[in-house]
């Protein structure tokens, strides 16, 4: 046929049977990728430490999505929350992966069938005998069916009426588990961090989709609207479908990057804004303050801080710290976290408690500065020792750990104090194993960062695709060179440009 690569899809332009075939094949590829990727991730996933080596630290991408929909057990006998299971049932991680692969195979066969048997009676216009599709009717059918699926997900799966529910956790990502969710019909349902909004919005959107689908099935579009929006042209469908996809991609890029009830931090890792705002640090200090108010010692109060909460308050888990083109999981960067060393408290020789200024997200290096409770600089690690006034040696800074593995251990030698001051810039201090994975010490992003980058990039690309195909379908006659007001009979093939008598072909 001699088509250039960027025009090959024109072969299905006026061929409804094969248009259906290639869409079924596309579904087969998507489903097959999802199932295969799930099996690969399960093969490399280590479920042994859900606290310090969770799925997002290991770079898992599809396992978090399965988990948030209610899958927690594996045929390997482990549970995502830790511990063992004896009867995971068919809907385990492997069961879902297998179902996707089986579905992919069935779609593959269906696609081949529709490619071979493309000339079906259902695609034929009775009046003309030519292939045609009633696109407004098909739109109504799709709207109705997607409405039913949307309503069913919200009313049955999420609520636990017929299904497992979804992953729900507390604001600090400590107590997450799969549970049923009641719809939130009040103003709280519009809070992106309230799980009940997921149920209520799916029920509401599904109901609207069902009603809209029935409307489009029973009411024909006016002729002027039909012609104005080119409703008979399949490229109109392509353009509006691309619009729906890029809009959804922009939305989910936002909910992933900024955080929401649909993207729990236990499954996808914390957001960069939680580091920027000191979100976990404030909660840790609040808990310690509560402990001290209950007459606990400083050591006892810090020992009650969960390792999970302390681990969130570490810059290495900030998805904005990893470069976009640094391949690999977080564990391949700074290493596998082994244990929390404890919270370091620095003091100078005058007894002031000092706080290390934390590194902002977009800095790779940052000066080590220690300030007191009033924000006054008391010590630092100087760049030029000759001019220093606040060096650790001059000020006599010591460090003592509370909680963690180094509980009640103190250091006064300047080299060790400076080492822990540098590490305190990065949040809570953890022992990291870099040997096992040959980790290079350079931070990586979490699946939260990869998902956002991918979806924002493709959304932008698809936005231009929508503009391109929308313009092509709306101005098709202009691009084809046909004057819509041309009344004269035109002999096709007589002119190089249709309807332009100045371009009459010369007979050789």
Curated annotation (Swiss-Prot):
GO terms for molecular function: chlorophyll binding; electron transporter, transferring electrons within the cyclic electron transport pathway of photosynthesis activity. Its main location: plastid. It comes from the Eukaryota. PANTHER family: PHOTOSYSTEM II CP43 REACTION CENTER PROTEIN. HAMAP family: PSII_PsbB_CP47. One of the components of the core complex of photosystem II (PSII). It binds chlorophyll and helps catalyze the primary light-induced photochemical processes of PSII. PSII is a light-driven water:plastoquinone oxidoreductase, using light energy to abstract electrons from H(2)O, generating O(2) and a proton gradient subsequently used for ATP formation. This is Photosystem II CP47 reaction center protein.
């Amino acid at each position: 046929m001699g088509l250039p690569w960027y025009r090959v899809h024109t072969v299905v332009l006026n061929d409804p049977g094969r248009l259906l075939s290639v869409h079924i094949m596309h579904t087969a590829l998507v489903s097959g990728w999802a199932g295969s990727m799930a099996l690969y991730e399960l093969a490399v996933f280590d479920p042994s430490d859900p606290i310090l080596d969770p799925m997002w630290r290991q770079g898992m991408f599809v396992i978090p999505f399965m988990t948030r929909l209610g899958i927690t057990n594996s045929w390997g006998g482990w549970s995502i929350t830790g511990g063992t299971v004896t009867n995971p049932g068919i809907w385990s991680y492997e069961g879902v992966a297998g179902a996707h692969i089986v579905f992919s195979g069935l779609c593959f066969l269906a696609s081949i069938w529709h490619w071979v048997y493309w000339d079906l009676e259902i695609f034929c216009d009775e009046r003309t005998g030519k292939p045609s599709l009633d696109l407004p009717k098909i739109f109504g059918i799709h709207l109705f069916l997607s409405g039913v699926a949307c309503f069913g997900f919200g009313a049955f799966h999420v609520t636990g009426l017929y299904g497992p529910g979804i992953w729900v956790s507390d604001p600090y990502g400590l107590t997450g588990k799969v549970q049923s969710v009641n719809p939130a019909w009040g103003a709280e349902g519009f809070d992106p961090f309230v799980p009940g909004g997921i149920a209520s919005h799916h029920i509401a959107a599904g109901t609207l989709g069902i009603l809209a689908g029935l409307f489009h099935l029973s009411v024909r579009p006016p002729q002027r609207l039909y012609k104005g929006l080119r409703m008979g042209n399949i490229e109109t469908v392509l353009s509006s479908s691309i619009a729906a996809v890029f809009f959804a991609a922009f939305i989910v890029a936002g909910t992933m990057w900024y955080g929401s009830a649909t993207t729990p931090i236990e499954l996808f890792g914390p957001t960069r804004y939680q580091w920027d705002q000191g979100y976990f640090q404030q909660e840790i200090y609040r808990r310690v303050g509560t402990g001290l108010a209950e007459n606990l010692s400083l050591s006892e109060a810090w020992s009650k801080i969960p390792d999970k909460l302390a681990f969130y308050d570490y810059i290495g888990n900030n998805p904005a710290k990893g470069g976009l083109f640094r391949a690999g999981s977080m564990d391949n960067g700074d290493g596998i976290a082994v244990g929390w060393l404890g919270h370091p408290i620095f003091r100078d020789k005058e007894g002031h408690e000092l706080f290390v200024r934390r590194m902002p997200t977009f800095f790779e290096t940052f000066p080590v500065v220690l300030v007191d409770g009033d924000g006054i600089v008391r010590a630092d690690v100087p760049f030029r020792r000759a001019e220093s006034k606040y060096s650790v040696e001059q000020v006599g800074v010591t460090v003592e750990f509370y909680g963690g593995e180094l509980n009640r251990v103190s250091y006064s030698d300047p080299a060790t104090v400076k080492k822990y001051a540098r590490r305190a810039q990065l949040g809570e201090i953890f022992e990291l194993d870099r040997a096992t994975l040959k980790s290079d010490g350079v931070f990586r992003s979490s699946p939260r960062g990869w998902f956002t980058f991918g979806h924002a990039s493709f959304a932008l690309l698809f936005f231009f695709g929508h503009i391109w195909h929308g313009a092509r379908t709306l101005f098709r006659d202009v691009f084809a060179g046909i004057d819509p007001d041309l009344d004269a009979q035109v002999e096709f093939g007589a002119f190089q440009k249709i309807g332009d008598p100045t371009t009459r072909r010369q007979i050789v």
